[in-house]
Curated annotation (Swiss-Prot):
The active site is at D263. Homodimer. SUPFAM superfamilies: Nucleotidylyl transferase, Ribokinase-like. This is Bifunctional protein HldE.
Amino acid sequence: MKLSMPRFDQAPVLVVGDVMLDRYWHGGTSRISPEAPVPVVKVEQIEDRPGGAANVALNIAALGAPASLVGVTGDDEAADSLSNSLKGAGVRALFQRIAHQPTIVKLRVMSRHQQLLRIDFEEPFATDALALGAQVDDLLEGIKVLVLSDYGKGALKNHQALIQAARAKGIPVLADPKGKDFSIYRGASLITPNLSEFEAIVGGCADEHELVTKGATLMHDLDLGALLVTRGEHGMTLLRPDHPALHLPARAREVFDVTGAGDTVISTLAAAIAAGEELPHAVALANLAAGIVVGKLGTAAISAPELRRAIQREEGSERGVLGLEQLLLAVADARAHNEKIVFTNGCFDILHAGHVTYLEQARAQGDRLIVAINDDASVSRLKGPGRPINSVDRRMAVLAGLGAVDWVISFAEGTPENLLREVKPDVLVKGGDYGIDQVVGADIVKAYGGAVKVLGLVENSSTTAIVEKIRKSE
């Protein structure tokens, strides 16, 4: 399956569910307490992160999608911290604050990135998250996906009202389920239990065949649009009526902390579906995102640049021959990491030592080098009959194999001016003995503040001379 980056900015999502604050006390441990056989942690830093449904909304916003959140909190300092964090991340949060009841807080005591202890501050809420004076229809206005983030803490008490209201508007409903009664999610477009949650409902599964069979029965009984079972190191299994099961292997390179991985899955799914992606593609993106987030410490969000880079790596486009869409994604990701983009162009028909030296010098002008080459018809117009000697595919393959070159792209026009307008490199480099103002595209690059540099050519290195020498020897 070919992966691509969705248009998350056009994908508004509403999250309703159990809001909590994940609080971390970071410190170091160097001795045992004289009072009891326990380590003493000297706290050096206190960190707050949105958790539960708030983490789902945060993940959606981090991908660039408009995110709204409805939940219940106490009327306390923890709720203030949550509100400030979410506002800073661009999440529109609507909290019902309950006096004399604490916001749910999960406090983790950390020593050198190892969790020593977790302390929970919570009382189940008896109040409906939607007792805000707002109507369900108003909340769903303009929304493309509804997420029910259920941690069984009492904020979600009206599953069916929400599901039916969304279905009436044609809005998909995604639910991250909890508890032993999945009937409350009847009619949802997709539910995303982990394996233990799934088996608590359907019974143990000896193998994938049994998982698929029991999953199909569950979908039928609950009128579900689809079922995604997350299976840890075994990846994910997507089940849909009248479709074969889709098994996706785990993508994690290194598992550091699984906290919040389920939130990342459902948030990526929601944002991708809201952006118009088909379910299998959305699941593949969620699988990729989960593989990234488990490599982070604690409750964490995945950013759009991180997902882009993972897609590029998956599609083999982190380096090499790219189309324009892939190149623009790669450039955006590089810029997100403060990398300087260098651009050069040419025919590069027969690659020689002069080319290699020139490209190494060009790469030294920044962090990433794009080489744009004329396609075959363009070379023929410029160089005359009998050229190019090598086809555009072969020329790009050779260039992509050079250590100095990050990305190679072809263009059909006589000049790369259209590419320059799209890519907007930080530096345009050309080899030759002419002035900067004579470089094709210099005016385009200088207009937006980019730099133009001319590098000298290596003497006695010429493709035309090589071609003539070969012809004379025949």
